[in-house]
Curated annotation (Swiss-Prot):
Gene name linked to the record: mprA
Coiled-coil region: none
Source species of the chain: Mycolicibacterium smegmatis (strain ATCC 700084 / mc(2)155)
Function comment: Member of the two-component regulatory system MprB/MprA which contributes to maintaining a balance among several systems involved in stress resistance and is required for establishment and maintenance of persistent infection in the host. Functions as a transcriptional regulator that recognizes a 19-bp nucleotide motif comprizing two loosely conserved 8-bp direct DNA-binding motif repeats separated by a 3-bp spacer region.
Residue ranges occupied by any Response regulatory domain in the UniProt entry: 4-118
Name of the protein this chain belongs to: Response regulator MprA
Gene3D superfamilies: 3.40.50.2300, 6.10.250.690, Winged helix-like DNA-binding domain superfamily/Winged helix DNA-binding domain (1.10.10.10)
Amino acid sequence: MAVRILVVDDDRAVRESLRRSLSFNGYSVELAQDGVEALDAITNNRPDALILDVMMPRLDGLEVCRQLRSTGDDLPILVLTARDSVSERVAGLDAGADDYLPKPFALEELLARMRALLRRTVSDDSGDSQKMTFSDLTLDPVTREVTRGGRQISLTRTEFSLLEMLIANPRRVLTRSRILEEVWGFDFPTSGNALEVYIGYLRRKTEAEGEPRLIHTVRGVGYVLRETPP
């Protein structure tokens, strides 16, 4: 049975382009032109994933994210943001989106992001696993709970996958390319700063109450989880 994706964008040309591309690649696609239509469609016939523009009339993409997450709905969400709008990306992730893609984008990259997001969704439900701990940071792969010093930390799927990879390899330097391959998939383009954005997000969330930094940059190589700078 085909994976069902709801595409939400007020630009008809964008909707139709995504419908053709996703359908050609084996997905079942439904369309909505604003947030109100999107929430109705999700209520009536819940899709497997959501591609959501941020700027829309009536109800924007950020509010759709917030409303879904406030009810505990963990529907995988990829938001489409303005090319140079860092604030939109930050707001989208804060609202609960799992990943973001700046416009204009290559369809190949959108397909790669969607495949990676759906892979992470499948891994969310797989098997039993032990809690992972480093310093005062704890991650539970089954319940998907993350705490630091007992403080609960809320992460999106992408942030969780990235932290899980780091905590599974404590004090080992992970190259940028290896992280991109494992978290986003082998077909993920290595250009752009998506990884840096998510590292920044993890740092902000894990250091929100002044805790010492655990995620360090190894310049020119990648990142490492350790108590002190390398």
